Amino acid sequence: MSPKARRAAGLQGASAALVLTNPPFFEAGKMRLSPNAARAFAHAAPAAAKSDEPFLSRWLHACAALLAPGGRLVVIHRADALAALLAALAGRVGGLRILPVQPRAAEPATRILVAAVKGSRAPLTLLPPLILHEADGRFTALAEDIHRGAALIAL
């Protein structure tokens, strides 16, 4: 999103203390889209624009541009997109904290939460995973507390 487009949308650059984002997880044409137009738009990045820059990189560049110095960016994405996400954030934010989210303890992470700070030079930190379910399918105690608002996700 260009600075002009951000201003037209009422978004002032370098002013946000916190930007939370859930970018589209998939590229258009690489998955079967929902027949619901709003869902399809939310789940798949639009077809390539005039830019050679990947969609995720453009999305996160726009998010980072909204942050004031010291502002925090929090992103949720697919775990298999971690490399692309790190590449997109390189040079824009620092102090990255990565929280893998696993469906169950014995399964690999399917999602990641990434928090970063504009202007930080702190090193990347890989946090212990957030495990959502016990082997029997019940929520873990922490996941249950998070859902009920009794605990926070430590990022």
Language model segments and positions:
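A short acidic, Gly/Pro-enriched loop at the edge of an enzyme's catalytic core
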Residues: S2-L20
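Mobile active-site "lid"/loop adjacent to the S-adenosyl-L-methionine
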Residues: A14-L18, P23-R58
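Generic structural "secondary-structure junction" signal
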Residues: E27-A28, H43, P103, L126, ...
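Short, glycine/acidic-enriched loop or turn micro-motifs at the edges of active sites
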Residues: P3, F25, K118
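Conserved Class I SAM-dependent methyltransferase catalytic core
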Residues: S51-A109
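Residue-level detector of flexible, active-site-proximal loop/helix-junction positions
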Residues: S2, Q102-A105, S120
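SAM/dcSAM-binding transferase cores
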Residues: A109-L155
